[in-house]
Amino acid sequence: MPGHEITQQLDVVYGSTVRSKHVGRDLLAGLKNIVGGELTAYTELLEESRQEAMQRMIAKAQQLGANAIVGIRFSTSNIAQGASELFVYGTAVIVQPNAPKLPDPFNP
């Protein structure tokens, strides 16, 4: 983090959610596959899943006393037919702002 220094590394934290597709979304996505274009229903589902997993990870970091998470990574996997997991993880840390450097009066 620019302007900050990691003073303590706490632990790996994670969050996940498992979501299933909706039959109505599947039908619309199937039609969209024929004509092409963005599958907005799935884009929205993925965004909701990402936010939920992130909030769970942040809550775990806060329980440890962290004020930042570094090295965040996302992963997805199929759990069952029609159900997928979105998994996010990172390292919970404590950061502090760097002390401002005072100008050297002898070396302008």
UniProtKB/Swiss-Prot annotation:
InterPro entries: UPF0145_dom_sf, UPF0145_YbjQ-like. It comes from the Bacteria. Pfam families: YbjQ_1 (PF01906). Signal peptide: none annotated. Belongs to the UPF0145 family. This is UPF0145 protein ACIAD2946.
